[in-house]
Regions:
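N-terminal cationic and glycine-rich segments that engage phosphates or anionic surfaces
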Residues: 2-89, 93-115, 123, 127-130, ...
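Function-critical acidic carboxylates
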Residues: 120
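Active-site alpha-helix of zinc metalloproteases
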Residues: 136
Length: 147
Protein backbone atom coordinates (compact mmCIF):
# COMPACT_ATOMS: atom_id res chain seq x y z
CA UNK A 1 0.00 0.00 0.00
CA UNK A 2 1.37 3.39 -0.98
CA UNK A 3 1.61 6.39 1.29
CA UNK A 4 -1.36 8.09 -0.35
CA UNK A 5 -3.55 5.02 0.14
CA UNK A 6 -2.42 4.75 3.77
CA UNK A 7 -3.46 8.36 4.39
CA UNK A 8 -6.91 7.67 2.93
CA UNK A 9 -7.28 4.55 5.11
CA UNK A 10 -6.20 6.50 8.18
CA UNK A 11 -8.82 9.17 7.43
CA UNK A 12 -11.48 6.45 7.51
CA UNK A 13 -10.06 5.03 10.74
CA UNK A 14 -10.03 8.47 12.37
CA UNK A 15 -13.63 9.04 11.28
CA UNK A 16 -14.72 5.74 12.83
CA UNK A 17 -12.86 6.38 16.08
CA UNK A 18 -14.12 9.96 16.38
CA UNK A 19 -10.63 11.50 16.37
CA UNK A 20 -11.61 14.83 14.81
CA UNK A 21 -8.18 16.46 15.03
CA UNK A 22 -6.44 13.56 13.23
CA UNK A 23 -9.25 13.34 10.67
CA UNK A 24 -9.10 17.04 9.87
CA UNK A 25 -5.29 17.06 9.72
CA UNK A 26 -5.26 14.11 7.33
CA UNK A 27 -7.97 15.67 5.20
CA UNK A 28 -5.87 18.84 4.85
CA UNK A 29 -2.90 16.69 3.92
CA UNK A 30 -4.92 14.76 1.35
CA UNK A 31 -6.18 18.05 -0.11
CA UNK A 32 -2.59 19.29 -0.49
CA UNK A 33 -1.64 16.07 -2.31
CA UNK A 34 -4.71 16.25 -4.54
CA UNK A 35 -3.98 19.90 -5.35
CA UNK A 36 -0.51 18.99 -6.63
CA UNK A 37 -1.99 16.16 -8.70
CA UNK A 38 -4.53 18.50 -10.28
CA UNK A 39 -2.09 21.38 -10.82
CA UNK A 40 0.59 19.23 -12.41
CA UNK A 41 -1.78 16.71 -14.03
CA UNK A 42 0.20 13.76 -12.72
CA UNK A 43 -0.23 10.76 -10.48
CA UNK A 44 2.00 11.13 -7.44
CA UNK A 45 4.79 8.64 -6.73
CA UNK A 46 5.74 7.90 -3.13
CA UNK A 47 8.93 9.97 -3.50
CA UNK A 48 6.89 12.97 -4.66
CA UNK A 49 4.43 12.43 -1.80
CA UNK A 50 7.37 12.45 0.64
CA UNK A 51 8.62 15.77 -0.74
CA UNK A 52 5.13 17.27 -0.40
CA UNK A 53 4.89 15.97 3.17
CA UNK A 54 8.23 17.62 3.97
CA UNK A 55 6.94 20.88 2.49
CA UNK A 56 3.83 20.65 4.64
CA UNK A 57 5.95 20.08 7.75
CA UNK A 58 8.10 23.09 6.87
CA UNK A 59 4.98 25.21 6.37
CA UNK A 60 3.65 24.18 9.78
CA UNK A 61 7.00 24.83 11.47
CA UNK A 62 6.98 28.35 10.02
CA UNK A 63 3.40 28.89 11.22
CA UNK A 64 4.27 27.59 14.69
CA UNK A 65 7.19 30.02 14.91
CA UNK A 66 4.93 32.93 14.00
CA UNK A 67 2.27 31.83 16.49
CA UNK A 68 4.94 31.48 19.18
CA UNK A 69 6.13 35.02 18.46
CA UNK A 70 2.54 36.21 18.73
CA UNK A 71 1.97 34.42 22.04
CA UNK A 72 -0.62 31.99 20.66
CA UNK A 73 0.40 28.79 22.45
CA UNK A 74 -2.90 27.10 21.61
CA UNK A 75 -2.18 27.39 17.89
CA UNK A 76 1.45 26.35 18.40
CA UNK A 77 0.23 23.10 19.98
CA UNK A 78 -2.17 22.53 17.09
CA UNK A 79 0.62 22.97 14.54
CA UNK A 80 2.94 20.67 16.52
CA UNK A 81 0.22 18.01 16.59
CA UNK A 82 -0.18 18.25 12.82
CA UNK A 83 3.60 18.00 12.36
CA UNK A 84 3.65 14.77 14.39
CA UNK A 85 0.85 13.30 12.29
CA UNK A 86 2.52 14.23 8.99
CA UNK A 87 5.96 13.05 10.14
CA UNK A 88 4.53 9.60 10.88
CA UNK A 89 4.16 9.06 7.11
CA UNK A 90 7.77 9.96 6.29
CA UNK A 91 10.53 7.35 6.18
CA UNK A 92 12.89 7.23 9.16
CA UNK A 93 15.20 10.23 9.17
CA UNK A 94 18.98 9.78 9.31
CA UNK A 95 20.68 10.55 12.61
CA UNK A 96 23.14 13.44 12.77
CA UNK A 97 26.10 11.03 12.84
CA UNK A 98 24.81 9.09 9.80
CA UNK A 99 24.16 12.34 7.98
CA UNK A 100 27.65 13.68 8.70
CA UNK A 101 29.21 10.39 7.54
CA UNK A 102 27.15 10.39 4.33
CA UNK A 103 28.08 14.02 3.61
CA UNK A 104 31.78 13.33 4.19
CA UNK A 105 31.79 10.27 1.94
CA UNK A 106 29.99 12.16 -0.86
CA UNK A 107 32.47 15.02 -0.60
CA UNK A 108 35.34 12.55 -0.85
CA UNK A 109 33.74 10.80 -3.86
CA UNK A 110 33.17 14.07 -5.69
CA UNK A 111 36.53 15.56 -4.75
CA UNK A 112 34.83 18.68 -3.42
CA UNK A 113 37.11 21.12 -1.64
CA UNK A 114 35.21 24.19 -0.52
CA UNK A 115 32.05 26.23 -0.46
CA UNK A 116 32.19 26.65 -4.24
CA UNK A 117 31.35 22.93 -4.59
CA UNK A 118 28.33 23.14 -2.27
CA UNK A 119 25.75 22.97 -5.08
CA UNK A 120 27.35 19.93 -6.69
CA UNK A 121 27.53 18.09 -3.35
CA UNK A 122 23.94 19.02 -2.43
CA UNK A 123 22.64 17.72 -5.76
CA UNK A 124 24.44 14.40 -5.33
CA UNK A 125 23.34 14.15 -1.69
CA UNK A 126 19.68 14.78 -2.55
CA UNK A 127 19.83 12.03 -5.18
CA UNK A 128 21.60 9.60 -2.86
CA UNK A 129 19.64 10.24 0.33
CA UNK A 130 16.23 11.14 -1.09
CA UNK A 131 13.52 11.74 1.47
CA UNK A 132 15.41 10.22 4.39
CA UNK A 133 16.73 13.65 5.33
CA UNK A 134 15.38 17.19 5.57
CA UNK A 135 16.99 19.66 3.15
CA UNK A 136 17.92 22.12 5.89
CA UNK A 137 19.69 19.44 7.96
CA UNK A 138 21.44 18.17 4.84
CA UNK A 139 22.65 21.66 3.94
CA UNK A 140 24.03 22.21 7.44
CA UNK A 141 25.84 18.84 7.40
CA UNK A 142 27.38 19.51 3.98
CA UNK A 143 28.52 23.00 5.05
CA UNK A 144 30.13 21.58 8.18
CA UNK A 145 31.86 18.80 6.22
CA UNK A 146 33.19 21.22 3.59
CA UNK A 147 34.88 23.44 6.20
Amino acid sequence: MGVREQILEDIKTAMKSGDHFRRDSLRMLNAALKQVEVDERISLSDERVFSILQSEIKRRNDSAAQYRAGGRDDLVQKEQGEIEIIASYLPAQLSDAELAAAASSLIAQLGASGAKDMGRVMKAAKEALGSSVDGKRLSEAVKAALK
